[in-house]
Amino acid sequence: MIKGIGLDMIDLERVKQVVEKNPRFIERVLTEKEIKQFEKYEGNRKIEFLAGRFAAKEAYAKANGTGFGKHLSFTDVEILQVEDGRPHVTLPANAGENVFVSITHTARSAAAQVIIEI
């Protein structure tokens, strides 16, 4: 049964400006494991990775119906690339959900869609 569907899109230039102004933004959005994947990239690909993860986490919060705040933070949701290249969502052990995520990029933006199944 589908619990929710979320969609988010973000401008790459906006993410780049935020990171330039506040580099700690990366640590607020990404988990330690995600940061290790992020650090493997160079230049604009880093911004694409960060923006894609940000959009995916926002899409998750929308699909969950909670948004981010008191009960959910960006680092509660971890999205890692698995061996075949797909993004895989890891949640706290008590979540009891199946989460499907798709992330895409253009030259100017990143977008993600999340479907939560219970």
UniProtKB/Swiss-Prot annotation:
It is found in: Cytoplasm. It catalyses: apo-[ACP] + CoA = holo-[ACP] + adenosine 3',5'-bisphosphate + H(+). GO terms for cellular component: cytoplasm. Its EC number is 2.7.8.7. GO terms for molecular function: holo-[acyl-carrier-protein] synthase activity; magnesium ion binding. Keywords: Cytoplasm, Fatty acid biosynthesis, Fatty acid metabolism, Lipid biosynthesis, Lipid metabolism, Magnesium, Metal-binding, Transferase. The keyword Ribonucleoprotein does not apply. Mg(2+) binds at residues 8, 58. GO terms for biological process: fatty acid biosynthetic process. The keyword Oxidoreductase does not apply. It holds the Pfam family ACPS. Its cofactor is Mg(2+). It comes from the Bacteria. It is an enzyme of class 2 (transferase). Belongs to the P-Pant transferase superfamily. AcpS family. Transfers the 4'-phosphopantetheine moiety from coenzyme A to a Ser of acyl-carrier-protein. This is Holo-[acyl-carrier-protein] synthase. It comes from Listeria monocytogenes serotype 4a (strain HCC23). The lineage of its organism: Bacteria, Bacillati, Bacillota, Bacilli, Bacillales. The gene is acpS.
